[in-house]
């Protein structure tokens, strides 16, 4: 080949010395007809598609590295063999359409049991009755701590939303607007959002005398769940119409939502925002669906989906490792997810492990302020504390489940 090129240049340019010949050879092998250097092994598409391809390859490589690192770090990762505490919770309602368990930033667990709402302190095991509804037709159906843990929002069967001072146990105010059972309440700073069986989503600015700032009605059946993204000010709502709506806080109206996600085939109660990617939302479908889905909310697309073959009642992300925990109810077919907790790797969604199967549904999940423990509430009228997201403290004594159960049964809650 080199001899042919040398003869070619001698024929057209006359005799060339060795230096000139080498220069001409280099130009013809490394430059195109316009004098620009060739780009070797690069996707030959449009500049835009080339950038996309490069980003995709980078993302795939990073995902591969993350998966490898996760696999290495999780070689000995397993689900706890048993809960660290079991608390008796008499009169905990076996109702999929309620949200009555929340672990606040002040390290108090709030739970509604029948007509009453209690707080429990994991540090000293102190129990306090915050309220008791004096009506046979009314009881708490949803609750949520404020970000500073000074107030608790309580949704009621009678359609009211109440704000309670957690320190003084005094009713601060009542907020109205719903016509039916309030299934979910969720804080976003000074904005309290509620959703009910009346299909409505309402925003209240709790600082204002006239507090109602937004009224939405797009779900064709009751609202099951509400979750605000703490980083990007986006609201996700799940409904009994099998739909998930994504809303931007600055543009909320019944005719203006970001996306309408319709991939579920049953009610969507379980919603959770990813703590390490604010664009990712996890959702879980009810009994006739059983799928756990991951969404990119900026694009409105499903990026992963698995079928658990069991009702997905609740979800919690692990803030310390790339994992997500699901709580399940009724199941069908050949599945090991029914009536138990399941831990999944993110983003592959391969199963790490799960709790022993219970005789009743896991209806609610909430995690401790440090993100190391998870509390689950079941239809068997118990609350279980799991050290599932982090290792137990080396010097912290572990109380047996039986001791905790007996101690709680001796409390005023029973």
What are these regions (language model features)?
Residues 75-94, 124:
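A short helix->beta-strand "capping" segment at the edge of beta-propeller domains
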Residues 90-95, 133-140, 176-182, 216-223, ...:
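WD40/WD-repeat beta-propeller blade N-cap
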Residues 97, 139, 148, 171, ...:
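WD40/WD-repeat beta-propeller blade-loop signature
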Residues 100-106, 143-149, 155, 185-191, ...:
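Loop/turn segments within WD40 beta-propeller blades
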Residues 112-114, 155-158, 195-198, 231, ...:
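Conserved strand-to-loop turn within each blade of WD40 beta-propeller repeats
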Residues 117-122, 155, 161-165, 185, ...:
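WD40-repeat beta-propellers
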């Amino acid at each position: 080949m080199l001899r042919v090129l040398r003869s070619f240049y001698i024929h057209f340019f006359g005799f060339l010395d060795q230096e000139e010949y080498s220069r001409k050879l280099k130009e013809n092998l490394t430059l195109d007809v316009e004098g620009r250097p060739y780009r070797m092994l690069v996707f030959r598409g449009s500049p835009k598609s080339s950038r996309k391809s490069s980003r995709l390859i980078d993302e795939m490589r990073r995902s591969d590295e993350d998966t490898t690192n996760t696999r290495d770090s999780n070689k000995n990762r397993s689900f706890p063999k048993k809960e660290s505490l079991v608390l008796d919770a008499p009169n905990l309602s076996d109702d999929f359409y309620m949200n009555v368990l929340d672990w606040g930033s002040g390290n108090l667990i709030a739970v509604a049991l029948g007509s009453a709402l209690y707080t429990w302190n994991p540090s000293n095991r102190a129990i306090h009755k915050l309220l008791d509804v004096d009506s046979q037709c009314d009881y708490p159906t949803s609750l949520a701590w404020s970000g500073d843990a000074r107030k608790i929002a309580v949704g009621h069967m009678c359609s009211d939303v109440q704000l309670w001072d957690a320190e003084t146990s005094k009713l601060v105010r009542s907020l109205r607007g719903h016509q039916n059972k309030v299934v979910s309440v969720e804080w976003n700073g000074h904005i309290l959002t509620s959703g009910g069986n009346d299909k409505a989503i309402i925003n209240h600015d709790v600082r204002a005398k006239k507090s109602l700032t937004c009224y939405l009605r797009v779900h064709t059946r009751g609202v099951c769940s509400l979750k605000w993204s703490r980083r990007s000010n986006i609201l996700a709502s799940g409904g009994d119409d099998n739909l998930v709506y994504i809303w931007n806080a600055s543009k909320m109206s019944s005719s203006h939502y970001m996306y309408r996600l319709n991939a579920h085939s049953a009610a969507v109660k379980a919603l959770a925002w990813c703590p390490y990617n604010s664009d990712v939302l996890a959702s879980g479908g009810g009994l006739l669906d059983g799928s756990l889905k991951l969404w990119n909310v900026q694009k409105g697309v499903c990026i992963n989906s698995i079928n658990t073959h069991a009702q997905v009642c609740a979800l919690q992300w692990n803030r310390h490792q790339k994992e997500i925990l699901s709580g399940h109810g009724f199941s069908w077919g050949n599945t090991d997810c029914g009536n138990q907790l399941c831990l999944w790797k993110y983003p592959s969604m391969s199963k790490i492990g799960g709790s022993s199967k219970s005789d009743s549904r896991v209806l609610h999940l909430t995690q401790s302020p440090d993100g190391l423990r998870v509390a689950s509430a079941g239809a068997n009228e118990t609350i279980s504390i799991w050290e599932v997201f982090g290792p137990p403290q080396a010097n912290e004594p572990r109380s047996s489940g039986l001791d905790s159960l007996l101690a709680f049964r001796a409390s005023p809650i029973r």
